[in-house]
Amino acid sequence: MAYNDLRDWIAALDRAGELKKIRTQADPILEIAEITDRVSKSRSARYGQGGPALLFQNIKGHPGSQLLINQFGSARRMNLALEVNSLEQVAERIRGFMDVKSPQGFLDKVKMLPMLAEMGKFFPKTVPTGPCKEVVKRDNFSLLDFPILQCWPKDSGRFITLPCVITRDPRTGKRNVGMYRMQVYDERTTGMHWQRQKVAAEHYRDAIRNAATSTAHVGTAALGGPAGQSPAATTAVDIMAKTSGASVPAEGAYPSGKMEVAVAIGTEPALTFSAIVPAPPEVEEFLIAGFLRQSPVELVKCETVDLDVPAHAEIVLEGYVNLDELRSEGPFGDHTGFYSLEDQYPVFHVTCVTHRKDPIYATTIVGTPPMEDGWMGKAVERIFLPLMKLTIPELVDINLPLEGVFHNLVIVSIRKSYPGQARKVMNAIWSLGQAMFTKCILVVDEDVDVHNLGEVTLKVLNNIDPERDIQFTLGPVDSLDHASRLPNYGSKMGIDATRKWASEGFTRPWPDEITMDATTKSLVDAKWKSLAKDLGIE
């Protein structure tokens, strides 16, 4: 049965022995982050088990508040979050839906009815009200009432780090739920870290184009018109609105040059996880969450903006971003293990806060791995492998090592059947959504275990001729890549570590790998139990 809300999830963690309640006073400025970092890198975490989820119940400056962190910080908790014994179960369900063929006749259509009925259960549904409306504050509110963390010494302030940020495509009306950090500037404003390749940033650019062609709120001045235009407005267009191609037709323009935004904090785990998944463009994250939890997400209307939010969220922030306003955001200690640099981003103005009575603030900390976000990334890797195979059918397995921080290294094994196939796979990966940011791709043969980094290292270094097998290309890179020649643009490397064929220009014989013959292995197998005991290596 799906978790109804964050509190159901916390109770499940407690029952499973995966939660530790911390009653010792801890400061949201740096101290809670340091405690969590030590837990994330504890002995159990290093051996792949992950430290426990933490519920802080005595937070300095916030009497009576509770804070949940590291809720996804182990493989077991990711399984618990999605209510499966193994993430392969989710992948198998995805494969099942992908295997559905177009019906060829009446009988085929009848056979599809149960599948269609099941899919219908996942769509979100709007309800009149929900727990997130237990307290409604249209004024007399402050973001600083919540125990928002400053995680690292050189962070530019407190950051909301686990939000579900809800926007709407001004062209199509489709909703998006994304996870973007939010620097708290004061009691009622935050930054919106919408990196330019993200969906919400595209919504923002579309809103600017619409407003520029259909209203006077942005108009020619915002597009570099008369002198006296505010630097913020000019910068907003320069950084966020410049795209190739013609302007979008004026439709669905936002009134007064504003774009409405809502933020849900403390949602049930499937929805929180859905905010980070690389969803196909036509699929809403609310639907993905319904699929993962096997039950629809309940939504309620906001009080001050025309958006729907999760009815069972602990906290909801409603508001808008001005289309001509940017503000300095960062530095921020990021998942790369380095501080992401200060830059200009849109500003979120909060118009209303709703929350549950005694809301539980859910957050996370990112930094040098292993940390909580790494386990979430590994779940994405496992669950979405079947979708990658739709585009790359020769793909056998994939590994995004934690040390590669998701976008620096991808290791794939392939079923090779023609010359140059490894390079084809590299280019296919660089064309797949967020995988376009991958800095380095290693391609190995299907018999290599991509999750065994020792085996991968051995095969890669033995199988390559560097000049022949390393490919360089240029393209988009992650905004957090501090080493690229330019922001958002740099080089990538692909390494073909597959066995080389004569049809690929390799004229020498390829040697056999060293393995013991089956007869000898059987003889030793019969003696091994006794030998191992004598040798003390059972």
Place the predicted regions along the sequence by residue.
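Intrinsic disorder/low-complexity segments
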Residues: 212-256
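Extended, highly charged
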Residues: 1-211, 255-332, 336-538
